[in-house]
């Protein structure tokens, strides 16, 4: 018994060998292809800390993002809403300063920002790439926005369908937003905030030439809102930048080179989502052979972390395809192709028309795409 106790005590002393005692500080990359001439940066431009109504210290925001595979975050604590002011002094720049220090150690880009928090209209606006957030702490919301623009900020309309200001959950555009747009004081809209997708905001971005954004608006520790260990992920803005830098992200935002990645859905302009989809896939068997009414399998490798759901819309006089095809993230899927006749022969290229149902180029409008491969048909003996 004494020997057992001693042995067990020695094991406990080396508790690092137990999985429950181990805690890896490790990064999980988000695999998304780059576009020609650009690097795809994974960003979250709406986060909060204890310096407004968030629940975590600013450096935690930086490490959370680094662990999740992000390239950049903006710290956007509220200007007007300071529920912790009895415990922490109001210091509008301090959360960014703290987060940036840890971000630099992790090679994570941290961007200074603030949330201008007013009643509707105009509602809540994020201003990022600020020089001094303290100057936005003024009574008149118009002056706060004007000051942000004088500092060179990129300004966007937050959660336009948030039920705290829109009880029916419907996003609305007001004359005040037209006013800001005319003054070059509004540049984008959150098409997704947390887990909410706003189709109205998606349409505004196309109609009014605004940048599409997708952000977490995180207040809690990230693990309380997202089941990271199950593959759950915060919403991200994919920014197509010329290089990995704050200035390049700013340029990409003003140029509207973004795509929304939220859950398993992509939302964006066709010029961006099409190459993103196409560069995610690699056909491993570009040539197949079919005898008569036999079958062949086209192997398609989805090299990204974005699963795709395809609805086959095209038809072929010689070949039959399934109605739907799923391309799981990081895996190889099979497209089954069957011959329609026993006596068909020849070799030709086949283009299978489809809709990528979880990639939206407009509200309720999926991306139209094609899968291409070569087939050789021979008669059935």
Where are each of the predicted segments found?
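Charged catalytic cores and adjacent phosphate/nucleic-acid-binding surfaces used
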Residues: 2, 23-43, 62, 120-131, ...
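Structural motif marking the loop-to-transmembrane transition
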Residues: 2-5, 141
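A metal-dependent hydrolase metal-coordination microenvironment
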Residues: 26-154, 158, 166-167, 184, ...
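Bacterial N-terminal signal peptides
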Residues: 7-17
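Hydrophobic alpha-helical membrane context
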Residues: 14-15, 58-60, 89, 229, ...
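Short gly/pro/ser/thr-enriched loop/turn and capping motifs at secondary-structure boundaries
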Residues: 80-81, 163-164, 219-222
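Sec/Tat signal peptide C-region and signal peptidase I cleavage site
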Residues: 18-22
């Amino acid at each position: 018994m004494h020997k057992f106790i001693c042995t067990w005590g020695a094991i406990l002393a080396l508790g690092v060998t137990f999985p429950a005692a181990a805690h890896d500080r490790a990064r999980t990359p988000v695999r998304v292809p780059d576009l020609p001439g650009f690097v795809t940066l994974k960003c979250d431009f709406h986060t909060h800390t204890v310096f407004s109504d968030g629940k975590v210290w600013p450096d935690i925001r930086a490490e959370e993002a680094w662990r999740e595979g992000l390239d950049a975050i903006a710290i956007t604590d509220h200007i007007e809403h300071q529920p912790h002011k009895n415990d922490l002094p109001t210091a509008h720049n301090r959360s960014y300063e703290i987060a940036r220090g840890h971000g630099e150690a992790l090679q994570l880009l941290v961007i200074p920002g603030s949330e201008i928090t007013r009643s509707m209209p105009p509602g809540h606006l994020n201003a990022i790439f600020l020089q001094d957030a303290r100057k936005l702490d003024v009574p008149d919301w118009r002056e706060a926005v004007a000051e942000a623009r004088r500092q060179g900020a990129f300004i966007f309309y937050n959660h336009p369908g948030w039920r705290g200001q829109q009880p029916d959950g419907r996003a609305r555009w007001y004359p005040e937003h037209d006013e800001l747009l005319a003054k070059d004081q509004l540049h984008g809209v959150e098409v997704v905030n947390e887990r909410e997708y706003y189709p109205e905001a998606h349409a505004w971005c196309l109609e009014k030439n605004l940048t599409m954004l997708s952000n977490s608006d995180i207040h809690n520790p990230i693990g309380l809102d997202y089941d990271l260990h199950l593959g759950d992920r915060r919403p991200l803005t994919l920014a197509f930048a010329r290089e990995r830098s704050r200035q390049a992200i700013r340029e990409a935002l003003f140029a509207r080179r973004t795509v929304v990645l939220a859950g398993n859905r992509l939302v964006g302009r066709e010029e961006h989502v099409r190459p993103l989809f196409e560069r995610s896939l690699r056909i491993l068997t570009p040539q197949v052979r079919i005898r008569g009414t036999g079958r062949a399998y086209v192997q398609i490798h989805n090299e990204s972390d974005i699963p795709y759901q395809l609805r086959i819309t095209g038809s072929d006089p010689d070949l039959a395809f399934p109605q739907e095809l799923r391309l799981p993230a990081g895996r190889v899927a099979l497209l089954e192709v069957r011959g329609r006749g026993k006596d068909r022969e020849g070799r030709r290229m086949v283009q299978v028309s489809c809709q990528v149902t979880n990639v939206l180029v407009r509200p309720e409008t999926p991306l139209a795409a094609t899968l291409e491969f070569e087939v050789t048909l021979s008669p059935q003996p």
